[in-house]
Amino acid sequence: MLSGVWFLSVLTVAGILQTESRKTAKDICKIRCLCEEKENVLNINCENKGFTTVSLLQPPQYRIYQLFLNGNLLTRLYPNEFVNYSNAVTLHLGNNGLQEIRPGAFSGLKTLKRLHLNNNKLEVLREDTFLGLESLEYLQADYNYISTIEAGAFSKLNKLKVLILNDNLLLSLPSNVFRFVLLTHLDLRGNRLKVMPFAGVLEHIGGIMEIQLEENPWNCTCDLLPLKAWLDTITVFVGEIVCETPFRLHGKDVTQLTRQDLCPRKSASGDSSQRSSHSDTHVQRLTPTTNPALNPTRAPKASRPPKMRNRPTPRVTVSKDRQSFGPIMVYQTKSPVALTCPSSCVCTSQSSDNGLNVNCQERKFTNISDLQPKPTSPKKLYLTGNYLQTVYKNDLLEYSSLDLLHLGNNRIAVIQEGAFTNLTSLRRLYLNGNYLEVLYPSMFDGLQSLQYLYLEYNVIKEIKPLTFDALINLQLLFLNNNLLRSLPDNIFGGTALTRLNLRNNHFSHLPVKGVLDQLPAFIQIDLQENPWDCTCDIMGLKDWTEHANSPVIINEVTCESPAKHAGEILKFLGREAICPENPNLSDGTILSMNHNTDTPRSLSVSPSSYPELHTEVPLSVLILGLLVVFILSVCFGAGLFVFVLKRRKGVPNVPRNATNLDVSSFQLQYGSYNTETNDKADGHVYNYIPPPVGQMCQNPIYMQKEGDPVAYYRNLQDFSYGNLEEKKEEPATLAYTISATELLEKQATPREPELLYQNIAERVKELPSAGLVHYNFCTLPKRQFAPSYESRRQNQDRINKTVLYGTPRKCFVGQSKPDHPLLQAKPQSEPDYLEVLEKQTAISQL
């Protein structure tokens, strides 16, 4: 009996609890939120209710439900915030301004399969952010400010298959971030990824079925080779991977480039230099702007947009009535929308917003209106390679959702006013390879969101003022390979350009004031292949490029005229060489390069838009510098060699026993003279034969001074000679003069050897006499002092001159016989000053 009562009590309590649970759930749906049951799943809609915490809600305990909390004020999620929500399978937390998720906030959500965190303010995904979500399969965190993901953020999400992280601020992905997950769909569009390594990232997503990598600033250099190699080996769907840098590859699809394009130096040194002819042809068509051999007035047929890779499963299901449904229908939160595609075109859809990529290239369309039926919500429209001649005003009225419009390589010569007015969301416009001649302002009305404008390879001759004023977000403008000769004032004043291509036009000079000074400081500009006239008019451009806040010049400005400067780089020319008559001339005052940055404008410039400064020296300049150094080295060596040879020839050969040199080293020559040959100086016994350096007489006045290496003579006082009047009456008398000289070329006639004495003590000896012939001599005493070798060497030239041109002061004439009648008298006379001066002049001329 007692047991029966107990059993009835338990049943009563259970019934009461079940009734209360149903009553509470009913009350939540009636009072606070809107509840709707679909396919046995309860949808609890609590959107825009102003909730600041989920603790105010009492979810049902015995039913599976989807909870929609979008548009509330849940800025922070604290630990155990959802501990009572164990039956939730879907949780929407979008548009809450959510900034922080504390560790353990999702504890208790063991059955949760889908989590939506889109459109919040999250910055970091930590390792403990998703604790408790072991059953999670779908994670959407797009449109946040996520810049950092820790390596173990997804390590506990072993069942995760779809990860949506588009439109965040990711610069890179950490190593092994996907190691413990089996992703099939990955969306990384609209981040700031430049490279993606294979090791640690790509190697862990081998089961991927779809990967979205568009709208990232991919740096197409050697660092991107791992991603390129991985893309070449997979067969899954891959969106467009468009190069942002370097400048030469901007706008090119990575999947259509070769290893040689990405890494020229590395490919040239390895085995990857081999290419298929198909790839070469396709790349050449894809990159018309980089081929200098093309006619600047008309481009070849443009390349096709990159073809999408085939997926293992159909991306778009098209029925007979051409209606299709978007991809990943299993994971969509909204009901699928029927999509239509024009006939003769191929359409693929965008995964995030069901937009279409419409590919209608080379279909022989003559008008855009020929596209029937109209595509539903097109995002990208490719009409390249058709026969379009005019873009009419009403052609694009139903294409307001376009993000990209490609009209390249048609025959477009006319764009009617207002043709693009409805394209308020368009960011990329391709008009390259057409027949446009004039650009005017109304041509681009309505394109306030435009960021990239391609106008290369037209026949543009004129740009009207204010043409680009409405393009306030324009960042890239390609005007290369046209026929432009000038630009109007303030043409770039209303833009936010970071890249400008004016290559291969007809510019001879560009004004700074009103044109170039309107550009921001960090712009990259290409001015090559223009006929620059390097005269005074180009001084403004030179000053602008050399300014402290100067832009990055892609390729140097090369002069074409005048002829003396043809082929020279403007930067290396001096101001005097360019404008010799006025080297200080400049094109107005160089205004601040940050002129446009002061204008209030909400621009988001990625780090890749800032130029990279390269300090590499051009190869031609390096070779020229080395050649100049080599020539200077050869000239210096030759000059040094000649100098050494001259020094060696100029050093005289001095005997080792120079200190013991005696008068015996002098050559004694005999010369006959007639005493009556000169009437003016008959009494002078010298015909001005300069004495040698050595001491010629023992008289103290002829002795050299101590330390003086040059011999000198005292004033002439005594001069001995015969009676002049008696000599005139006598027949010609032969006389011999004994002198020590090294420069007389005429030798005396042979005579019997006479004895000459080197010592005054030997004067007592008699010389042989023959009648009236007598001898005049000077005794040569031995030297009492000989200059050192060093002093003789240092003053050798001066000594030689003294020997040749020294003026004699005094000399003795010895008597031949004391009983000679003509020599008994010893008259003395002073020499004539004019005679001495005349003889000195004559000798100096010799």
UniProtKB/Swiss-Prot annotation:
Disruption phenotype: Conditional knockout of the gene causes impaired long-term memory and abnormal gait. Excitatory neuronal development is abnormal in the mutant animals as evidenced by a reduction of excitatory synaptic puncta in the hippocampus. Hippocampal CA1 pyramidal cell-targeted knockout of the gene results in impaired synapse maintenance and abnormal retention of spatial reference memory.
Chain intervals with Low complexity compositional bias: 267-276, 285-300
Record GO cellular component, one term: glutamatergic synapse
Keyword Protein biosynthesis: no
Entry keyword Transmembrane helix: yes
Domain (LRRNT) ranges: 332-374
Stretch list, region Required for interaction with PTPRD: 167-215
InterPro entries found in the cross-reference section: Cys-rich_flank_reg_C, Leu-rich_rpt, Leu-rich_rpt_typical-subtyp, LRR_dom_sf, LRRNT
Effect of D187A: Abolishes interaction with PTPRD. Abolishes synapse assembly
Extracellular side, ranges: 22-622
Domain LRRCT: from-to ranges: 216-265, 530-581
Tissue expression as described in the entry: In the adult, significant expression is detected only in the brain. Broadly expressed in embryonic brain with highest expression in ventricular layer, subventricular zone, cortical plate, pyramidal layer of hippocampus, subicular neuroepithelium, thalamus, hypothalamus and spinal cord.
Subunit structure: Interacts with PTPRD; this interaction is PTPRD splicing-dependent and may induce pre-synaptic differentiation. Interacts with NTRK2.
Protein family: Belongs to the SLITRK family.
Function, as annotated: It is involved in synaptogenesis. Promotes excitatory synapse differentiation. Suppresses neurite outgrowth. Involved in the negative regulation of NTRK2.
Name of protein: SLIT and NTRK-like protein 2
